[in-house]
Amino acid sequence: MTNTVITKWSQDMKFETMLPNGVSLMLGSSAEGDEKIPSPKVLMLSSLAVCSGLDVVSILEKMKIQLSDFKITSEANLTDEHPKYYNKVSLGYYFYGEDLDKEKINKAVNLSITKYCGVMEMFRSFAE
């Protein structure tokens, strides 16, 4: 499957990206002082968390595990030298609900990390 994303310079350090589903996103550099526009690297971390989260929720639903809430934190170290990239990434998984089966939750997270999350696989090529 091929995805096409069209990205157009908007102004200053801002770009508009049209996703394959027609949704438009504004991305750029926070150096311009506009904190409401995400940077490409921060969006990568968000994509990593969402990719894994989708896997985990899907797996837990199949295991009949009911969550009341679930969040993932992504923390990454950016290198000092150019090209700056994330060389270390850690994810924290937080589950909330009654009578949660920790063994099944750990299995779901492990399956996402080792087998299903394609974004995780891409991150493996450049980060610990």
What does each model-found stretch correspond to?
Residues 51:
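Alpha-helical metal-binding/catalytic segments enriched in His/Glu/Asp
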Residues 1-46, 57-128:
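Extended beta-strand/beta-hairpin segments
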